[in-house]
A protein has these predicted regions:
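Acidic anion/phosphate-binding donor-loop and adjacent secondary structure
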Residues: 32-38, 80-93
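A short beta-strand/loop micro-motif in the catalytic core of glycosyltransferases
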Residues: 51-57, 162
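Nucleotide-sugar donor-binding and catalytic loop/hinge architecture
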Residues: 18-20, 87-99, 242-243
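Catalytic donor nucleotide-activated moiety binding site of glycosyltransferases and closely related
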Residues: 24-32, 60-64, 104-105, 110-147, ...
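Aromatic- and Gly/Pro-rich donor/ligand-binding loops
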Residues: 1-45
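Leloir-type glycosyltransferase catalytic cores
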Residues: 142, 196-243
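A donor-sugar binding/catalytic signature common to diverse glycosyltransferases
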Residues: 154-195
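Donor nucleotide-activated moiety binding/catalytic core segment of transferases
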Residues: 72-80, 84, 131-132, 136-164
Length: 243
């Protein structure tokens, strides 16, 4: 929410409407490793009023330190604070057969090509969540403007997920899916997805249209999420309770 690419300087994201004594961030994301020079002074001004900083990726800790001289903590994205069992309660799916799911934050021909290649290898159909004007490709079934329940269901019931989206990565992890993630994009590198997977010990990066299907130890991954959830909730309780 602190990415200059996404929000510019909408005051709401920096809590300028609130008293400084009430300003805390939780899992805020800059989405980039460094700020362009033209944003630095404005970010310093906006952030210095916060009491505590929580960010989504380690690079955010570094940015907060550079901008404010203070320390930030890295915590889980809110989607990961909710268990898979809870998400399953709202999940709805109209697809009754195994499939490969594509979900992209922006159009990516490389992901489509990778998914189609995977489709041939696994003999599975490909479905793509398509809210934006993505290029239409033959051999792909499109899911247009799903409801929240249908969106969650798309990930819950997929056999494989191919994505370049942070939340596509997050929901794949929540449901322990066989995932393939492209970090590189037109805007640079998706440090949010990269940071999440590295913190969980998952190596599934698509590079030049290829990705090794390395084994994922989901027991270890789920243990790490459980431990990080406890730390994240303790942080939230520290100021919600007046700490």
């Amino acid at each position: 929410m602190w990415s200059p690419r996404c929000v510019g300087f909408d005051p709401a994201y920096f809590l300028t409407f609130a008293d400084d004594r009430q300003k805390y961030s939780y899992a805020a994301s800059f989405a980039i490793p460094t700020l362009p020079d033209e944003f630095i002074d404005e970010y310093k001004k906006r952030l210095n009023g916060f009491q505590k900083f929580s960010v989504r990726e380690p690079s955010g800790e570094k940015l907060v330190k550079e901008l404010t001289g203070r320390t930030a903590e890295t915590h889980l994205d809110p989607t990961l604070l909710i268990s898979a069992d809870e998400w399953k309660k709202i999940a709805v799916s109209k697809i009754d057969k195994p499939y490969i799911l594509i979900f992209t934050a922006n159009p990516a021909v490389s992901l489509v090509d990778f998914a189609l290649k995977l489709s041939k290898e696994k003999n599975l159909p490909v479905y793509c969540i398509n809210d934006a004007p993505h290029p239409v490709s033959h051999g792909i079934n499109y899911i247009v403007a799903p409801t929240v329940e249908e969106f969650v269901g798309c990930f819950k019931n997929a056999e494989y997920v191919v994505t370049n989206s942070f939340h596509g990565t997050a929901f794949s992890v929540i449901f322990n899916k066989n995932l393939f993630v492209e970090f590189k994009n037109k805007s640079g590198r998706n440090i949010r997805s990269e940071g999440l997977l590295k913190s969980l010990g998952i190596d599934r990066e698509i590079v030049d249209g290829n990705c090794r299907e390395t084994e994922i130890n989901w027991y270890d991954v789920n243990e790490k999420i459980t431990n990080q959830t406890i730390i994240s909730l303790d942080y939230l309780k520290s100021f919600v309770s007046g700490g």
